[in-house]
């Protein structure tokens, strides 16, 4: 079975030899057909610590490196897409403010 290869944006590089990659996907709703966006964060192994916040990277499935790390960074696709990171941070900030007030996201 081939290994999964995903493309996403580095949203955190604060850990040693690890980056957090946000992968967004789109798919049509099974009944209504509306295109839905979903995102997921993956921890990826970066042994040389060369990928920075905002980089668009490809990650590939690998052996388990730690409890949550199951991917490693394959290559850099595009450098410094800070607009995508800012959009993610604003969305996260809005979600946190709603959860503090007791509202639903």
Curated annotation (Swiss-Prot):
An annotated GO cellular component of this protein is: cytosolic small ribosomal subunit
Top-down, what is the taxonomic lineage of the species of origin? Bacteria, Thermotogati, Deinococcota, Deinococci, Thermales
**Source taxon at top rank:** Bacteria
PROSITE patterns noted in UniProt: RIBOSOMAL_S17
UniProt protein name: Small ribosomal subunit protein uS17
Q: Give a GO molecular function annotation for the protein.
A: structural constituent of ribosome
The consequence of inactivating this gene is: Increased generation time and a temperature-sensitive phenotype.
Q: Name one Pfam family in it.
A: Ribosomal_S17
Protein purpose: One of the primary rRNA binding proteins, it binds directly to 16S rRNA where it helps nucleate assembly of the platform and body of the 30S subunit by bringing together and stabilizing interactions between several different RNA helices. The combined cluster of proteins S8, S12 and S17 appears to hold together the shoulder and platform of the 30S subunit.
Family according to the record: Belongs to the universal ribosomal protein uS17 family.
Q: How does it assemble?
A: Part of the 30S ribosomal subunit. Contacts protein S12.
């Amino acid at each position: 079975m081939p290994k999964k290869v995903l493309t996403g944006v580095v949203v955190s590089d604060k850990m040693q030899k690890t980056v957090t990659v946000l992968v967004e996907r789109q798919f049509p709703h099974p009944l209504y057909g509306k295109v839905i966006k979903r995102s997921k964060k993956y921890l990826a192994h970066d042994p040389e610590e060369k990928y920075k916040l905002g980089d668009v990277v490809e990650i590939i499935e690998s052996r388990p490196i730690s409890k949550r790390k199951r991917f490693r960074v394959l290559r850099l696709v595009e450098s410094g897409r800070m607009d995508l990171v800012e959009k993610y941070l604003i969305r996260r900030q809005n979600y946190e403010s709603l959860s503090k007030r007791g509202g639903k996201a």
